[in-house]
């Protein structure tokens, strides 16, 4: 098939009668001689010139030859009969329409096999992922589609999906992606209450636990509404959130300036009511200190809401989760989120060339905050011994993040 592409890159170059070639006149049948019979292109002085009818006949014959030859051109994607050159390559109408629709809508496809499905006339509709992959591989050009008139509609969540795992590296596209991340945030500052934004305010035990529950719910609800995540298999969604919920919790705590005073935290964990050895108390307080340090380091960078959204997306889309059905796809989503953050920081903070690196360097240390400590500090009073991972799974499977059985979240 590749040989066909090379042979028909410009069909006019190989067709008789193309531009620059004068059709030979028909040899005279009657009348005086019109020059030597071996050189009909240069008739003698007495020879009659070509008539319009003869030229028209030659042109029609040439056009017919071109049409006949073009009918034998195969679609470089599926091998069906080509209808012409579309977006840089000869394709059939079906592959042309499929490619245009996929690029204009930025549709995301998933291969259920090994990303190497056969694409021919009989199988081209069985795997959209591999069909689009082949369209790009044979040289169909995205930019040729995007130069066309775009529908004047507001982009929706699905319109910012990846194609073939490759992000569209343009500023407007990444800006749109960040806008959708921000739009998915279910928790404006006011939702957590005024106490959250008052670092010097010492919150009561009940308020601390309620705030923690709100932040956990918000992390799950945000993930359910950002681009790409809802398109993943539910098992992958559960695996990603079960691994990263504690890191998202720390980012949310920093974003809302959650007060982290030691005494209320120890009381919330119930440590004041149960006897503990001195060593265990010291170890637990060390965990609290690590939590406090991570939050303070993020607050010191004055991270804005767009940066927080990108950081959370980078954390969420991690290929470290066990049992992912498509590791490469999740990696591409993380890379896309990282590119969006880099583009945003470069445009919004041009005088801080090291800002992007500083933000990324904060992420690995988030895992130093023990998830079991977060559970004991904030959730043991609400859910007892029920693992947070189980609650996250139930929230995703139920389709609602705000069905907490132990308290009412307004």
From Swiss-Prot:
UniProt biased composition (Pro residues): 24-51
DNA-binding region: 72-147
Main location as per UniProt: nucleus
All copies of domain NR LBD, residue ranges: 173-399
Biological processes annotated in GO: cell differentiation; negative regulation of transcription by RNA polymerase II; nervous system development; positive regulation of DNA-templated transcription
Assembly with partners or alone: Binds DNA as a homodimer.
Tissue specificity of this protein: Highly expressed in the developing spinal motor neurons.
Family affiliation: Belongs to the nuclear hormone receptor family. NR2 subfamily.
Full protein name: COUP transcription factor 2
Keywords tagged on the record: Activator, DNA-binding, Metal-binding, Nucleus, Receptor, Transcription, Transcription regulation, Zinc, Zinc-finger
Annotated Gene Ontology cellular component terms: nucleus
Chain intervals for the UniProt region annotation (Important for dimerization): 333-410
Domain of life: Eukaryota
Low complexity composition bias: residue spans: 52-68
InterPro entries given in the database record: NHR-like_dom_sf (IPR035500), Nucl_hrmn_rcpt_lig-bd (IPR000536), Nuclear_hormone_rcpt_NR2 (IPR050274), Nuclear_hrmn_rcpt (IPR001723), Znf_hrmn_rcpt (IPR001628), Znf_NHR/GATA (IPR013088)
Source organism (scientific name): Gallus gallus
Biological function: Ligand-activated transcription factor. Activated by high concentrations of 9-cis-retinoic acid and all-trans-retinoic acid, but not by dexamethasone, cortisol or progesterone (in vitro). May be involved in motor neuron development.
One MF annotation (Gene Ontology) recorded for this entry: zinc ion binding
Region span, Disordered: 1-68
Zinc finger map (NR C4-type): 75-95, 111-135
Gene expressing this chain: NR2F2
Subcellular compartments: Nucleus
């Amino acid at each position: 098939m590749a040989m066909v592409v090379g042979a028909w890159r410009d069909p006019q170059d190989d067709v008789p009668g193309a531009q620059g070639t004068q059709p030979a006149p028909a040899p005279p049948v009657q009348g005086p001689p019109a020059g030597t019979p071996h050189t009909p292109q240069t008739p003698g002085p007495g020879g009659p010139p070509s008539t319009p009818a003869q030229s028209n006949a030659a042109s029609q014959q040439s056009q017919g030859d071109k049409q006949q030859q073009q009918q034998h051109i195969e679609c470089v994607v599926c091998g069906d009969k080509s209808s012409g050159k579309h977006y840089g390559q000869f394709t059939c109408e079906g592959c042309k329409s499929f490619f245009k629709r996929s690029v204009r809508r930025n549709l995301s496809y998933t291969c259920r096999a090994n990303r190497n499905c056969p694409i021919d006339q009989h199988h081209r509709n069985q795997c959209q992922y591999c069909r689009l992959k082949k369209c790009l591989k044979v040289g169909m050009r995205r930019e040729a589609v995007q130069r066309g008139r775009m529908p004047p509609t507001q982009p929706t969540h699905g319109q910012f999906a990846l194609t073939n795992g490759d992000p569209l590296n343009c500023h407007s596209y990444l800006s749109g992606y960040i806008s959708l991340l921000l739009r998915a945030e279910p928790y404006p500052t006011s939702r957590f209450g005024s106490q959250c934004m008052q670092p010097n305010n010492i919150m009561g035990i009940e308020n601390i636990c309620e705030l923690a529950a709100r932040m956990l719910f918000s992390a799950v609800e945000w993930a359910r509404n950002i681009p790409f995540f809802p398109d993943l298999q539910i098992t992958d969604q559960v695996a990603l959130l079960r691994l990263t919920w504690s890191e998202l919790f720390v980012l949310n705590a920093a974003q809302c300036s959650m007060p982290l005073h030691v005494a209320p935290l120890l009381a919330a964990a119930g440590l004041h009511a149960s006897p503990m050895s001195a060593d265990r108390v010291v170890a637990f307080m060390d965990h609290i200190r690590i939590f406090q340090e991570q939050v303070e380091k993020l607050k010191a960078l004055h991270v804005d809401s767009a940066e927080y959204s990108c950081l959370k997306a980078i954390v969420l889309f991690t290929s470290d989760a066990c049992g992912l059905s498509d590791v490469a796809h999740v990696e591409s989503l993380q890379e896309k989120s990282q590119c969006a953050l880099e583009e945003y920081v470069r445009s919004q903070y041009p005088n801080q060339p090291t800002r992007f690196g500083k933000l990324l360097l904060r992420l690995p240390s988030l895992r130093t905050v023990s998830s079991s400590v977060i559970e004991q500090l904030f959730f043991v009073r609400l859910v007892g011994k029920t693992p947070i991972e189980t609650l996250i799974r139930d929230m995703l499977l139920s389709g609602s993040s705000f069905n907490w059985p132990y308290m009412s979240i307004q």
